């Protein structure tokens, strides 16, 4: 059986925690930051956990994580 391929785009965007969950960056912190409050930008800088309904799709894209 051939080796499974990793989706490289997903590999750059997701990391796996020690418990097997996936983390992701939050959106809206790339540009147009001038009008956003400091508190909002700080909250957006933290990593988020991928929703459980999306975990299966992410794990299929990353077979070796």
From Swiss-Prot:
InterPro entries: Ribosomal_bL35 (IPR001706), Ribosomal_bL35-like (IPR021137), Ribosomal_bL35_CS (IPR018265), Ribosomal_bL35_sf (IPR037229)
Positions of the UniProt region annotated as Disordered: 1-28
Presence of the UniProt keyword Membrane in the record: no
Keywords from the UniProt entry: Ribonucleoprotein, Ribosomal protein
Listed GO biological process terms: translation
Alphabetized PROSITE patterns for the sequence: RIBOSOMAL_L35
Superkingdom of this protein's organism: Bacteria
GO molecular function: structural constituent of ribosome
Basic residues composition bias: residue spans: 1-15
A cellular component annotation (GO) from this entry: cytosolic large ribosomal subunit
Annotated family: Belongs to the bacterial ribosomal protein bL35 family.
Protein name from the UniProt record: Large ribosomal subunit protein bL35
